[in-house]
Amino acid sequence: MRIADYSVTRAILERHGFTFKKSFGQNFLTDTNILQKIVDTAEIDKKVNVIEIGPGIGALTEFLAESAAEVMAFEIDDRLVPILADTLRDFDNVTVVNQDILKVNLAQYIAEFKNPDLPIKVVANLPYYITTPILMHLIESGIPFSEFVVMMQREVADRISAQPNTKAYGSLSIAVQYYMTAKVAFIVPRKVFVPAPNVDSAILKMVRRERPAVEVQDEKFFFKVSKASFVHRRKTLWNNLTSYFGKSEETKGKLTAALERAELSPSVRGEALSLEEFACLADALKSEGL
């Protein structure tokens, strides 16, 4: 019997008198086939350390611990810590950290792995309400995670992995794909969770690039420009850029020169631009002193 078997999950919750907190976005997976598929997608073996976020009662953790060298699971809900101590008691390669992943010194914890030099993968069922902040925090942390295999709301997974000229493509696609390749591995129906969420989920596989997808003069500025270009999706690049940088004649002159330098039409929409075109645009705007 597995932790994720529906009857076992129910028994664990009842035994510990656990009630779900909406504020933590708790939805526990009760399908062992999907859990195995997640581990297979992440290609976990004894030469890999794993960071898990939001282990819940340990359904995914159990599968990860069987395959990985070590698992470090960050759980914000202190009510779940004694439950995890119970459900994972047979594993000596799991550390549960009762902390908010957004607030810890992650490098310090990673140094505590028995073999901290092994590749580190992030495998998690992320809370819907805070998926993007967690992902960006980890991606931008400077810690060289080799791979992320994470479950999230299907719509968010589609946005992250989207390509130009699609409805889902936006600043989030650019922010992630600058650092990682991103691909939806498979869809997870809502009915396999307790409690069932209102939407389906997706498993997103992201692999870190050896170097960023494009070269830019100023990374922060590149992300600001891409974000500004999607503020009003139906508006042209020109309208979004003038809204962000200003509408004085001097600014308009600089914007015109930058667009010409980047070989972009003012009437194009942000969703049509590739990462390479955004890089050219950001560098051109920077060169114009904007």
Curated annotation (Swiss-Prot):
Report the EC code(s) recorded for this entry: 2.1.1.182
Sorted alphabetically, which SUPFAM superfamilies does this protein's record hold?
S-adenosyl-L-methionine-dependent methyltransferases
Tell me where it resides: Cytoplasm
Physiological role: Specifically dimethylates two adjacent adenosines (A1518 and A1519) in the loop of a conserved hairpin near the 3'-end of 16S rRNA in the 30S particle. May play a critical role in biogenesis of 30S subunits.
Database matches in Pfam families: RrnaAD
Per its record, how is this protein called by name? Ribosomal RNA small subunit methyltransferase A
Catalytic activity from the UniProt record: adenosine(1518)/adenosine(1519) in 16S rRNA + 4 S-adenosyl-L-methionine = N(6)-dimethyladenosine(1518)/N(6)-dimethyladenosine(1519) in 16S rRNA + 4 S-adenosyl-L-homocysteine + 4 H(+)
Sorted alphabetically, the keyword list is: Cytoplasm, Methyltransferase, RNA-binding, rRNA processing, S-adenosyl-L-methionine, Transferase
Taxonomic source organism: Streptococcus sanguinis (strain SK36)
Describe the family membership recorded for this protein in Swiss-Prot or TrEMBL.
Belongs to the class I-like SAM-binding methyltransferase superfamily. rRNA adenine N(6)-methyltransferase family. RsmA subfamily.
Per UniProt, where does S-adenosyl-L-methionine bind?
A: 27, 29, 54, 75, 100, 125
Q: Which Gene3D superfamilies match?
A: Ribosomal RNA adenine dimethylase-like, domain 2, Vaccinia Virus protein VP39
Q: Which domain of life is it from?
A: Bacteria
The broad enzyme category this protein falls into is transferase
Q: Which GO terms describe its molecular function?
A: 16S rRNA (adenine(1518)-N(6)/adenine(1519)-N(6))-dimethyltransferase activity; RNA binding
What InterPro entries does the record point to? KsgA/Erm, rRNA_Ade_diMease-like_C, rRNA_Ade_Mease_Trfase_CS, rRNA_Ade_methylase_Trfase_N, rRNA_adenine_dimethylase, SAM-dependent_MTases_sf
Which GO CC terms are listed, alphabetically? Answer: cytosol
